[in-house]
Amino acid sequence: MTLEMLPEQIQESKIYREWGLTDEEYLKIKDEILGGRLPNFTETGMYAVMWSEHCCYKNSKPVLKKFPTTGPQVLMGPGEGAGVVDIGDDLAVVFKAESHNHPSYVEPYEGAATGSGGIIRDIFSMGARPIAILDSLRFGPIDNGKTRHIVDQVTAGIAGYGNCIGIPTVGGEVAFDESYAGNPLVNVMCVGLIEHKHIQKGQAKGVGNSIFYVGAKTGRDGIHGASFASKEFGSGSETQRSAVQVGDPFMEKLLLEACIEVIQNHGDILVGIQDMGAAGLVSSTSEMASKAGSGLRLNLDNVPQRETEMIPYEMMLSESQERMVLCVKKGHEQEIIDLFKKYDLDAVNIGEVTDDGFYTLYHKGQMVAHVPVDSLAEDAPTYYREAKVPERIQKFTDSEKYLPEITDSAVSEIFKKLLAQPTIASKKSIYETYDSRVMTNTVVAPGSDAAVLRVRGTNKALAMTTDCNARYLYLDPEKGGAIAVAEAARNIVASGGKPLAITDCLNFGNPEKPEQFWELTTAADGISRSCLALDTPVISGNVSLYNETNGSAILPTPMIGMVGLIEDVKNITTQEFKKAGDLIVLVGQTFDDFSGSELQKMLTGEISGKIDFDLETEKVNQDFVLKAITDGLINSAHDLSEGGLAIALAESAFANGLGIDVEVDLSNAQLFSETQGRFVLSISPENQAAFEKLLTESSASSEVIGKVTDNGILKINELSISTDEAVSIYEGALPCLMK
């Protein structure tokens, strides 16, 4: 049991600093908000979590305003539990990504599992049925025993939660770098489907309407989890296990089904619904009231508790999982109680909506908190941080491009070594632990450019992906941010889809350090530039700052999650070559783009230099490839990313054990160049004339560089290796490194 301090003791001891409040913020609460009254223990705790970066985005809010968030396809953008995008037929796709980085270092299994649980609740709080999970993971060097343990437990946590709740984990990405050794990134994206009429909002309005607590009971787990996620790691951070929540996917499954039933069958009595996520009960309820311009009066005696003698501070700040808040029309309380009882879940009336604009809590007959509701939510402070260009950026800008030389005799060995690099090597050993087929909607499972799920009752499908190459952002945050969006769109296009919108997880260092804030705001400029050019507005997202360990920051890593629409399932395209005799086509020109590449990192052990990115060419090439796919001219498509052309060709040949015979006017090194905006396609010879005619109507560049063979040999200029040997290296590298 936590011992409450008196208001005077809080002021004198300054314990609020440990909870994340600054002296200035504490004085603002006391003098400006409470009119000179000292905040009590519960109130101080509530402000500490609600004014954390994790909850109020006080450092990043000005940056987020840069993003384009509207478009004809957008039904609901940032501000609700998740974004909503129209896909026609009175249907919409709902999606969002969340981070659970700090908890996943302290308790990797539970941190990753509850990250999945939280984002799933965000989706069904909108009224949507979750249909897919994707993850974007970053770890330290895999030759480190601690890293291997974290990789094993994080992937087990994601698999355990998703598999048990019955939602397929269909895609994602994994990368390794020294900067993540003490601060792994666990970003989870969830996608759902909904009929327009069932779309919900997280609001509490209508004086006298009831506030219901539904789901699991409240414990002491996760208290100050939001504050924990809003500061750097230090030497004692690994012991902060009380800030990590514990999940129960079977409870979440019941909660999901109960909430969907309320929304679909009792929508007329439901005013609003919201997940109890970061900052638990205080966050969900105060945000619902603030958005509606209401007040709330809550009786904490009614909060279901799984531990004894919990005090108001603990009940309000607990981040126990599998809990939701519902605002229900007055007079219909019993209907809600009866429905949740059917699922053996608590559904308890804990308060009511008021019109006084205050957030008032009672416990054992005593008022234990009384503050303006907007001061907890909408009126939380916003800071405009100083931005300063890091010294390394000017150094990279002034430097020459990195240009490796690879001899004919060395190119095959270089290729083999690249195949075994942890970031390039097959992640099959990870994604095979996930159930990617449950719900039976998965058409393209993990391993291709994007996952594809059919939309039942229509002829449509959804393509989805997560992407970010943080090395590019380290060299140039603006171009790197733009590339992250462009690569996500390339993956959607290569799967036959039209990109619709993005969600993001902005993983950066300490925003109070000018160089770190510059990385954040500059990356946002690049993301915005690509989103505008590619017509992919930002509809939801998450900010995770303070990703530093003992003062050392991670690489800037804005993970981009994207969903695209495939209008006709016949246009679904995968990356693998289909049959011998098909022509291999390279779309896009190749230049000497090695700065930040896998090749540079492998050969030199570092990344340096300046990068180029032509967004206009990217858009032209994407439009051309999508048109060729929808015209039925393409048998396979694969985007070029890490490792360049040689790796993309190999990955295209692997699935069906085919060979390739490629002659292309590139140097040995250029086979591994990472020039953006490129695709590898295969087409039937009988479609070549139609393909070339379509090319004349576009300004895209394209050339036939070879053909698919059945001899089991990968031959690219002077590079030659058997497909079987290459597959063995590619699929065996990660399992071997994990031993």
From Swiss-Prot:
CDD domains: PurL_repeat1 (cd02203), PurL_repeat2 (cd02204). Mg(2+) 1 binds at E98, N542. SUPFAM superfamilies: PurM C-terminal domain-like, PurM N-terminal domain-like. It catalyses: N(2)-formyl-N(1)-(5-phospho-beta-D-ribosyl)glycinamide + L-glutamine + ATP + H2O = 2-formamido-N(1)-(5-O-phospho-beta-D-ribosyl)acetamidine + L-glutamate + ADP + phosphate + H(+). One of its GO terms (biological process) is 'de novo' IMP biosynthetic process. Substrate binds at S99, H100, N101, H102, R121, Q245, E319, S320, Q321, S544. Keywords: ATP-binding, Cytoplasm, Ligase, Magnesium, Metal-binding, Nucleotide-binding, Purine biosynthesis. GO terms for cellular component: cytoplasm. Signal peptide: none annotated. Pathway: Purine metabolism; IMP biosynthesis via de novo pathway; 5-amino-1-(5-phospho-D-ribosyl)imidazole from N(2)-formyl-N(1)-(5-phospho-D-ribosyl)glycinamide: step 1/2. Belongs to the FGAMS family. HAMAP family: PurL_2. This is Phosphoribosylformylglycinamidine synthase subunit PurL. It comes from Lactococcus lactis subsp. cremoris (strain SK11). The gene is purL.
